[in-house]
Amino acid sequence: MFDQFFSQISFVDIFNICVLLVFTICYTYQFFYIFEVLVHRHKGLKAKKNHRYAVVIAARNERAVVGNLIHSINVQNYPQELIDVFVVADNCTDDTADVAREAGATVFKRTNDKEVGKGYALDYAFQIIRSQYADRKYEAYFVFDADNVLDVNYFREMNKTFDNGAKASTSYRNSKNYDSNWISAGYAVWFLREAKFLNQARLNLHTSCAISGTGFFISADIIDAAGGWKWHLLTEDIEFSVSSILNGVRIAYCPTAVLYDEQPTTFRDSWNQRERWAKGFYQVFWNYGARLVKGMAANPKGHRFACYDMLMTIAPGMLLTIISVIFNAIIIALGATGAMSTGTVVASSVSSIIFCLANYMLFMFVNGVLTTFVEWDSIHSTTGRKIRYMFTFPFFMLTYVPIALVALFHNTQWKPIRHTIDVGVEDIAEQSAKIENSRF
C-alpha cells in the first residue's frame, strides 16, 4: 500500500508537502497562544511608587496631530510633575515645532538628510536629554508616534509594569480610525491580534514580548548602557526587541495601558509602509537570525524560547509562501508551453496554488473573526462595519504577498506617512461612553 502511494507522488508533491510541514512545525505554537489567552487571565499589578519619565516623540510634519498627543499626556491620571515631554521636529517643513511647543513640549529641531529615519531622531533626542537634562534623573523613556492619542490612565497603568521590575514594555495598541476604510481596519485588526494573541500570551507564559513601533517604554539603564538609541535598521523596533532578547532582557506587556494609533487610509501609503516593514524584517533576519538560533541553545534558561519565538516572528515565512507559489507557477507555465508533458504534475501544481491561497485566506479570515469578536468592545465602530471588515481582512493580508516580493529586491527607503485624523482624547472617551451605554 505504501509503495503504491509513494510511487504516485511527484517531486512537486514532495516539495509542497515539505513546505506545509515546515509551516506547521514552526508555527503550531501560536495556536497554543490563542488557547492560553482564551483560558487564562493575567492578574493585574499594583505600584508602590510613582516614577519619573521622559516622553520622546519623533515628528516630521505632524502639525495636524501632535497637539492631540501632547494634550492626552497633559491630562493623564498621573502626577504631571513626573512627566516631561520632548518632541524632535525632524526635518520638518511645517510648523510642527511651534504647535508642539505651544502644547507644552520641549522641542528639539533636527535637520539631517543623510541619516533619515525614526531611529536617528530618537538617538538625537536621547543624546540631548542625557547631556542637558541629566539632573532630572529620568527612570525610563516613553516613545510615541506623533499621531497617537493616549487613554487617560495610560501612564498610571504602565507605571505599574515599570514598578514591578520591567526594563521595557509595550502596551495595548488600538486604532483611532478603524472605520475609515478596509485598509485602516486591516491594520487595526492586525495590531489587536498582535496585542491579544501574541503579547498577552507571552505575558501569561512569562516569556518576552516585542515592541511594535510605538507605545512603549525603555528603562534609562538600557539607553545609558547602549549610549543612546543604537538600532537603525528599517524596523528599529523589531531590531531593539531582538537585541534585548539576545541580551537576556524580557520585554513586558501592559494590556491595560491603551494607545490609539492612526492607520493609513490609502493603498499607496499602506504599500510604502508595509514594504518598509517587510524589508526591515529581512534586514533583522539577516543580521540577527544566526544569533537567535544560537540563543535557542546558549541563552540562559527562561530566555531560550523567546529566541525561538522572535526567530519565527522575523523569519521570512511570507517568502517561503512566495517561493512555493512561484515554483508551482513555473511548473504550470512549462506545462502550458509543452516543455513538460506530465499532466499529473501540472495538475498537482494548479491544485497546490489554489490550496495554498485558499488556506492562507481561510487562516486570515479565522484570525480576523476571532480577533474582532474577542476585542469587540475595544473597536470603536458600528456592528455592520465590524462584520464587513472581517471579510475584507483576508484580502488586506493577501496584499502582503506582492509587497514582500518587491521588498526582497527593491532598495526600500524610509518614507514619511501623512497623518491627518484630528481625534483627541475627549473624542475617544465619548466614543467609549456611547459603546458602554449601548449595552444597557
What positions do the PLM features span?
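N-proximal low-complexity "stem/linker" segments adjacent to membrane-targeting elements
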Residues: 1-72
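Juxtamembrane C-terminal module of membrane proteins
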Residues: 32-50, 291-310, 333-440
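Cell-envelope/extracellular polymer assembly enzymes that use nucleotide-activated donors
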Residues: 51-54, 84, 224, 239
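Acidic helix N-cap motif at the loop->helix transition within catalytic regions
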Residues: 67, 94-101, 109, 118, ...
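Short, acidic, metal-binding catalytic loop of nucleotide-sugar glycosyltransferases
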Residues: 71-82
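A conserved acidic beta->alpha catalytic loop
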Residues: 89-97, 112-114, 149
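Long helical/loop segments within the catalytic core of UDP-sugar-dependent glycosyltransferases
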Residues: 111, 115-134, 152-234, 275-278, ...
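Short beta-strand-to-loop acidic/aromatic patch adjacent to the donor-nucleotide binding site
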Residues: 133-149
